[in-house]
Amino acid sequence: MTAAGAVMRAGALLVAAALLAPLAAPAGTTSPLPPLSAFPRERIAVETRSARRHVFEAWRADTPDTRAQGLMFVKSLRPEQAMIFVYEPAQHVGMWMKNTLIPLDMLFVDDGGCVAKVHERARPGDLCTVESGVPVVLVVELAGGT
């Protein structure tokens, strides 16, 4: 199963990813890293148990360099924006908040499409590792509290 085609379920959530044409990204960085506008874009749909659907425009981080950069130095993230980290094949993943300026929620998605873990409101700049706990193919980062 490819990460882009995964359907993610975890009690209250159903998440589907669909590839979109690259879109311009308004969030900038204050570092020599490539701007987020250089990242490919995808649309992420999150559906609650009560069938409420939330759509996010997500930057795709699917290389070692883009996964290492993530949302570093991004000063704001609108509620409808996200970043997805793609891992193929599925693997144990550890995320941290180094050089991340905003709080984030993280969804860890296994290769069966299930959200295996949710970590809410990761603290900006925190160097503690947030572990997936199981092999995952995606990590979805959303604005903290989303």
Over which residues does each language-model region extend?
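Compact, glycine-rich, soluble single-domain proteins
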Residues: G28-T146
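Bacterial N-terminal signal peptides that target proteins for export
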Residues: M1-L13
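Bacterial N-terminal signal peptides
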Residues: G11-P22
